């Protein structure tokens, strides 16, 4: 790790802090989640050390229902740090500049959604982003820039990559811990068995992860939609798209050759589900994959026998990495797979990193604690890229 951290920053300065507070929004209401918990550590430390703090963050994308103001985020953050947090409905307009100038030591000000700025979203080179009006207007108002948004570090957006080229830049505590944990699989050497639980909805993510880690990982335990696509490649009639959802057929057409090739080349490393769960008259029902005769049911989870097969593999591992959920865990009926493997990991002393998609949410939903795992990542896309060894531009600019 070659970037500067908060340990290298003198107390009491005025700092611009990029967080990732992007959250689920239901009926216009921002939902509290673990990202606020995590980033509260960084913000609370800055407050305690007398910094004047202005926060940058994004929410949703233009045109979507979750594209809302950060006013609610400021209130939620205040609850998490048990400290007053102000909000201004501009990102770098005259009122924002005025409120920034009025900051005193220990004050926290949340600026408006960065994605409401025209300069923010286009993916462009960091050098281009550093010259935008957004960056050039704010850079002289602060002593330093802190990026704590590891989960957005794969995006070349102005608030993430522009400021480090024109200001002293540091990594926040979330950036620091996520980077160390999520690069461990690429850098750490293990003497014993390394297992990866791979689920989720995107076949391309699974293919990329397995391709890059086939020499590091001894066993891939598959589930989710991606796992069903591998079952289809093995000859099972699964992957039924309900209500024209196009979760399976489109991905199969795009990735079938890669999946079939991977299954053929690495069959001894890949463990597939032996049974699957579906809804039957409102209840959970399970079926052995060997008994499936036609593609006519939408499967929503791996079955209990699969969890029983996966659990001993996990218990015998020195290290376990998790990418994505094994089923539709938000519905308790179909949480058996995801909750089952997470409980198996929690019951061991292995080195573990859990991340990807909503997996961290499953830990909270089913009564587990984060400290039962080595590290629980709040990152999605950045986690996948870290696993595959891809460069994270938001990290790279901090290391310059």
Swiss-Prot record:
Query: Which pathway, per its entry?
Result: Carbohydrate degradation; glycolysis; pyruvate from D-glyceraldehyde 3-phosphate: step 2/5
Q: Provide the binding site for substrate.
A: 20-22, 35, 58-61, 115, 155
Record-linked Gene3D superfamilies: Phosphoglycerate kinase, N-terminal domain (3.40.50.1260)
How is the subunit organization of this protein annotated in UniProt? Monomer.
Which SUPFAM superfamilies does UniProt cross-reference here? Phosphoglycerate kinase (SSF53748)
Q: Highest taxon of the source? A: Archaea
Spell out the family assignment given in the record's similarity comment.
Answer: Belongs to the phosphoglycerate kinase family.
| The protein's Enzyme Commission number | 2.7.2.3
Reaction equations catalysed: (2R)-3-phosphoglycerate + ATP = (2R)-3-phospho-glyceroyl phosphate + ADP
Q: Which UniProt keywords apply?
A: ATP-binding, Cytoplasm, Glycolysis, Kinase, Nucleotide-binding, Transferase
Q: Where is it predominantly found?
A: cytoplasm
Task: Please provide the Gene Ontology terms (biological process) for this protein.
Answer: gluconeogenesis; glycolytic process
Q: What is this protein called?
A: Phosphoglycerate kinase
Q: Where does ATP bind?
A: 330, 356-359
Where does this protein come from, organism-wise?
Haloarcula marismortui (strain ATCC 43049 / DSM 3752 / JCM 8966 / VKM B-1809) (Halobacterium marismortui)
């Amino acid at each position: 790790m070659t970037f500067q951290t908060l340990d290298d920053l003198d107390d009491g300065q005025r700092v611009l802090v990029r967080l990732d507070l992007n959250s689920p929004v239901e009926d216009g209401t921002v939902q509290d989640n673990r990202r606020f918990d995590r980033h509260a550590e960084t913000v609370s430390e800055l407050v305690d050390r007398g910094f004047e703090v202005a926060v940058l963050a994004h929410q949703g994308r233009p045109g979507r229902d979750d594209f809302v103001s950060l006013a609610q985020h400021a209130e939620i953050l205040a609850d998490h740090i048990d400290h007053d947090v102000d909000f201004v409905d501009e990102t770098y307009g005259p009122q924002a500049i005025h409120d920034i100038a009025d900051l005193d030591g220990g004050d926290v000000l949340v600026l408006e959604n960065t994605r409401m700025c025209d300069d923010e979203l286009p993916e462009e080179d960091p050098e281009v982003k550093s010259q935008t009006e957004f960056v050039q207007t704010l850079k002289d108002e602060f002593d330093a820039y802190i990026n704590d948004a590891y989960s957005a570090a794969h995006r070349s957006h102005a608030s993430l990559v522009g400021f480090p080229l024109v200001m002293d830049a540091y990594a926040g505590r979330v950036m620091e811990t996520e980077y160390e944990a999520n690069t461990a699989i690429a850098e750490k050497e293990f003497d014993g068995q390394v297992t990866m639980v791979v689920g989720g909805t995107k076949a391309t993510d699974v293919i990329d992860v397995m391709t890059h880690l086939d020499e590091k990982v001894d066993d891939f335990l598959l589930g989710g939609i991606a796992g069903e696509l591998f079952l289809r490649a093995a000859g099972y009639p699964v992957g039924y798209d309900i209500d024209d959802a196009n979760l399976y057929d489109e991905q199969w057409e795009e990735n079938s050759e890669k999946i079939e090739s991977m299954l053929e080349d690495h069959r001894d490393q890949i463990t597939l589900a032996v049974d699957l769960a579906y809804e039957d008259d409102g209840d959970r029902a399970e079926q052995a994959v060997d008994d499936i005769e036609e593609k006519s049911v939408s499967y929503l989870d791996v079955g209990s026998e699969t969890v029983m097969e996966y659990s001993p593999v996990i218990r015998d591992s020195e290290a376990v990495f998790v990418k994505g959920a094994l089923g539709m865990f938000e519905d308790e009926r179909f949480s058996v797979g995801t909750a089952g493997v997470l409980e198996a990991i929690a019951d061991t002393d292995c080195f573990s990193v859990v991340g990807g998609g909503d997996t961290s949410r499953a830990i909270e939903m089913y009564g587990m604690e984060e400290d039962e795992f080595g590290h629980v990542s709040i990152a999605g896309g950045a986690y996948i890229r870290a696993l595959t060894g891809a460069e994270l531009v938001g990290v790279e600019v901090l290391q310059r």
